[in-house]
């Protein structure tokens, strides 16, 4: 049997009226989205993220890559962008166009610093290369705080992570937090 009307939905005013009568429309505002997102970030006992309420702004982007683009554009005017070796490869691609440096380990981080306020750092949690928190995460955040290095925290794999507990109140250098919905929910095809 051939598809009716080219497989398009059949418009039926009775069905639409019934549907509209049983479903209360709930507009998705940015405030509601941010609220649900913050709750979702802490839905599991296997991980926790405290301190999000202290961030003044919440927004959605076209994925974590757009956040990285914006962070790098914002800070590359007057800061060198730092990335730990083994982190997301996308950063290196952008590093071709800005002052950029890979850092192999925490000790090297201290060696490459040119002074306070001259760098910005992107770091993932769980760390891309390890699948868990970077073993030097807390010390790196301490260095960033002391040296006035703004940090973009990449939580792309947060939705499928375990054993990650971060209290943003302890890490004031973290100025931006981004996460991905495509990893835990496979939303890639919904763009």
Regions found by a protein language model. Name each.
Residues 61-67, 84-90, 128-129, 157-159, ...:
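Gly/Ser/Thr-rich loops at beta-strand to alpha-helix junctions
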Residues 55, 77-80, 116-119, 146-150, ...:
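A general structural motif
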Residues 92-94, 110-114, 186-190:
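Short, charged, surface-exposed secondary-structure boundary motifs
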Residues 5-9, 89-90, 104-162:
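Active-site phosphate-binding strand-loop segment of PLP-dependent enzymes
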Residues 37-49, 131-190:
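Active-site pre-lysine segment of PLP-dependent enzymes
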Residues 71-92, 101-110:
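Conserved PLP-anchoring active-site segment centered on the Schiff-base-forming lysine
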Residues 1-66, 70, 74, 86:
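Conserved N-terminal alpha-helix of the aminotransferase class I/II PLP-enzyme fold
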Residues 94-108, 117-119, 173-180:
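Active-site regions of enzymes building and remodeling cell-envelope glycoconjugates
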């Amino acid at each position: 049997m051939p598809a009716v009307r080219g497989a398009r939905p059949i418009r039926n005013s009775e069905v639409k009226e019934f549907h509209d009568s049983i479903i209360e429309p709930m507009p998705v505002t940015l405030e509601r989205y941010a609220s649900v997102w913050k709750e979702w970030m802490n839905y599991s006992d296997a991980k926790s993220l405290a301190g999000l309420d202290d961030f003044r702004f919440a927004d959605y982007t076209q994925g974590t890559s757009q956040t990285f683009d914006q962070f790098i554009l914002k800070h590359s005017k007057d800061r060198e962008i730092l990335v730990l070796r083994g982190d997301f490869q996308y950063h290196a691609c952008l590093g071709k166009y800005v002052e950029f440096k890979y850092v192999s380990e925490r000790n090297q981080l201290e060696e490459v610093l040119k002074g306070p306020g001259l760098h910005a750092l992107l770091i993932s949690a769980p760390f891309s290369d390890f699948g868990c928190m970077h073993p030097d995460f807390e010390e790196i955040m301490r260095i960033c705080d002391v040296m006035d290095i703004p940090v973009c925290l990449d939580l792309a794999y947060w939705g499928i992570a375990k054993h990650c507990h971060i209290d943003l109140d302890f890490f004031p250098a973290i100025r931006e937090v981004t996460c991905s919905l495509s990893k835990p929910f496979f939303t890639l095809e919904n763009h």
